[in-house]
């Protein structure tokens, strides 16, 4: 779905850009919505355990990312709950460039979905042989040598509904996909899904996506707008939330992207008044849209009543 919408009966009131399908045609940096995949790769490769007693040291500077002096050691769950860049980068340093590239390639990034080829922009995934020193670090939290469209990002999250395997996207309901590619192990996928459940708790950055009475898991993301090939100088943001429900065997996955969000929810802190992030914009849009879907799904409702 795209908004603002257009009225074909009054096409003279719109420009060609108004008719653009932004879900397929816009290539963007997905920001922190990619952090779960970094942790999945690390868990599969055995460089983390993602247990409650495993602690990641976040006291040392890595590249341009400085310690925030708020945390000294963090669990993987806390890193994802707080969307902590340095913690994610520390984990990424344990991984090989080739493994990153291969996993992101299997997730479909940089490749056409084949849904509507005439309008789709598949983005890019630069080959690891052309990466600089900072590219792996940037890639670990959704920046650097990759761009993607929103449909590709939503598709990547389908692994949480398919035990780590990636199906193709379909426009026709109930068509069977017998060529799913296994990207991550079922065990690792289930563990990270459990952690994403905590991201939408009151402790996590996605708590505004919580829907009372329903299971929801997901991840926030924020990226600076790229205008004419350069990051915006006026602080323009693009915010994301990608989530799914229920947490175990999800039936619905939704990806939300907001461009130039201007009115973002803030609480008591006046310094955050103009600070738009996935947590206080896209997560709220997700909450409203997903809630309407869940309360109108007879199957979901019958399970709640049983």
Annotate each language-model stretch with its function.
Residues 1-32, 37-265, 278:
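Beta-lactam-recognizing serine transpeptidase/beta-lactamase-like catalytic domain environment
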Residues 180, 273-306:
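Short, gly/Ser/Thr-rich active-site loops of penicillin-recognizing serine hydrolases
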Residues 261, 271-273:
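A hydrophobic, small-residue-rich beta->alpha segment in the mid-to-C-terminal subdomain
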């Amino acid at each position: 779905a795209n908004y603002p919408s257009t009225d074909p009966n009054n096409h003279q009131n719109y420009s060609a850009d108004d008719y653009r399908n932004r879900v397929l045609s816009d290539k963007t940096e997905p920001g922190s919505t990619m952090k779960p995949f970094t942790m999945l790769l690390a868990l599969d490769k055995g460089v983390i355990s993602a247990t409650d007693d495993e602690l990641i040291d976040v006291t040392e500077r890595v590249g341009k990312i400085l310690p925030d002096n708020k945390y000294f050691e963090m669990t993987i769950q806390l890193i994802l709950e707080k969307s902590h860049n340095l913690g994610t980068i520390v984990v990424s340093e344990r991984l090989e460039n080739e493994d990153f590239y291969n996993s992101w390639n299997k997730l479909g990034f940089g490749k056409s979905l084949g849904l509507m080829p005439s309008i789709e922009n598949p983005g890019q995934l630069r080959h690891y042989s052309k990466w600089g020193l900072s590219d792996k670090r940037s890639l670990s939290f959704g920046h650097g040598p990759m761009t993607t469209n929103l449909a590709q990002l939503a598709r990547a999250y389908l692994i949480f509904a398919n035990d780590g395997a990636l199906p193709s996207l379909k426009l026709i309901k109930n068509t069977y996909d017998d060529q799913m590619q296994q990207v991550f192990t079922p065990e690792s996928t289930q563990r990270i899904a459990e952690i994403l459940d905590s991201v939408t708790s009151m402790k996590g950055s996605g708590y505004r996506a919580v829907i009372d009475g329903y299971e929801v898991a997901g991840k926030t993301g924020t990226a600076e707008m790229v205008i004419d090939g350069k990051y915006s100088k006026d602080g323009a943001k693009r915010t994301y939330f990608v989530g799914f429900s229920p947490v175990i065997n999800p039936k619905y996955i939704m990806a939300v992207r907001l461009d130039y969000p201007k009115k973002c929810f803030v609480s008591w802190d006046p310094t955050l008044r103009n600070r738009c992030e996935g947590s206080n914009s896209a997560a709220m849009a997700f909450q409203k849209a997903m809630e309407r879907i869940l309360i109108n799904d007879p199957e979901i409702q019958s399970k709640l009543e049983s």
